[in-house]
Structure formats: C-alpha cells, structure tokens
C-alpha cells in the first residue's frame, strides 16, 4: 500500500528552500579559513549535559518559551532533533532569573553574499536586557557589535568564533545588578566563555537596546533569543541558578 503524500505549509517549504541555498553556497564557495596565529576554539563543552539543579530551556520542545508580548502563547520556532531555528518574532523564557550559569549552543548560517550585521545575526538577552551578540564574525577583527560582544559595550578579548555552519558554545556566568530601593548600587557582571576561550572576564555591563519591554535593571528577568531575520539555530540551552 502506498503511503499518503505529505504536504507542508508555505513556511516549511520556504524554510527548507532557504536551508538548501545555504547548503549549496557552503559546498560551492566554502567558509573562510582561520589565520595560523589565531587562538583555537575547542568543543570541550559542546553537548554538555545540564548539571543537578539546572533547568533545560531548549531540548526537544520550546515549552519553556513564549513570544514577546504574548506570555500565554506558544513559541512557534520550529524544533527539529533538539535544534530550534529562529522564525518570526523573538522569544523569551516564561520564568525569570537573577544570578545564574547559562549554557547555549548556537549555529549561524553561511551567508557569503551578506556583510556585517546581516551575516547570521541573533542575540542572547540575559535577564531580557543585556544582549550577548550572535553573528558570523569568524576571522574578523572584532568590534563591539560582533559575535561575543555585549552589544555596543564590550569587545571580546579574543575572536573565539568558529566558521559558520558549525555548532558553537557560550558558557555564561551572570550576576545581576544590586539595588538599594530603586537605585542601582552595583552593576551586573558577567564572564563569557565562547568555544572554550574566555572572551569576557568578570566585566560590568549596563542594559542594551532591543530587549524585553518592562524588565527593569536589578530585578529578575527572562532569557530572550532574538529574531533578527536570519536562520540561526539554538540547541542544548540550560540554566542553573547561582547563590547571590
């Protein structure tokens, strides 16, 4: 007996076509190569399992997430074999967090016909208000809007990026700002390890534009993943609260 013919939504067909173009471009052109004197990223935390006390944010589903501005709605990014692909609209966690350890694995597309902020752009917003940039910045002299930067604030100390189409890791230790009344008396601080290399080492940060509305500095906040129009993927995202 013949199996019934499956049909797919226009969005699914469009998504498949875009991925096909990325794959063809990668085969025909190939990503750039790393300079010999550049530091070497590692895979030592790729696939790292969540420790005791951690909450899985992206596994097989996006049940922990909702669209921005629609807390009761379901996040609609497609998830295939544990990897979520950016679709229409940024998403945020339903829960909020103060001090934490966050593990994120991401994969940026190969877009050789694009430049700058159009090359695999997304962002991980800590507490919904501090953006850790995601971008194809492989082999570049980094600026404060490149991959691994706290957007428009901190330039990574080293370029730890892998080529596009390879899975990469962020391991983030974050301590929230401290308040006395409504006044911030201690800014938020964080350390970021990208692909096994420390790129930000215990630096103070302030809120960046474009995050979750109505989240205030010093209070608990969600994790937000940004839709910037590129097919960035995320997987194995988990978070573990830390003591103040």
Segments predicted by a language model, with ranges:
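Carbohydrate-interacting regions of secretory-pathway proteins
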Residues: 32-244
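N-terminal secretory signal peptides that target proteins for export/translocation
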Residues: 1-14
């Amino acid at each position: 007996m013949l199996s019934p013919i499956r049909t797919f939504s226009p969005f699914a067909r469009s998504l498949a076509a875009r991925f096909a173009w990325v794959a063809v471009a990668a085969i025909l052109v190939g990503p750039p190569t790393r300079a010999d004197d550049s530091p070497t990223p590692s895979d030592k935390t790729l696939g790292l399992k969540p420790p005791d006390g951690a909450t899985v944010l992206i596994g097989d589903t996006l049940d922990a997430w909702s669209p921005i501005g629609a807390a009761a709605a379901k996040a609609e990014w497609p998830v295939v074999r544990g990897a979520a692909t950016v679709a229409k609209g940024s998403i945020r966690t339903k829960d909020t967090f103060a001090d934490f350890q966050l593990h994120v694995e991401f994969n940026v597309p190969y877009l050789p016909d694009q430049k700058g902020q159009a090359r695999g752009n997304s962002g991980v917003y800590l507490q919904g208000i501090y953006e850790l940039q995601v971008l194809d910045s492989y082999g570049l002299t980094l600026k404060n809007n490149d991959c691994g930067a706290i957007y428009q604030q901190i330039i990574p100390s080293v370029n730890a990026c892998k080529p596009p189409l390879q899975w990469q890791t962020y391991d983030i230790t974050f301590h929230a700002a401290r308040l006395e009344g409504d006044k911030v008396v201690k800014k938020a601080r964080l350390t970021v390890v990208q692909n096994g290399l420390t790129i930000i080492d215990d630096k103070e940060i302030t809120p960046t534009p474009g995050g979750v509305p109505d989240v205030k500095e010093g209070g608990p906040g969600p994790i937000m993943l940004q839709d910037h129009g590129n097919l960035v993927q995320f997987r194995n995202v988990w978070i573990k609260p830390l003591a103040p």
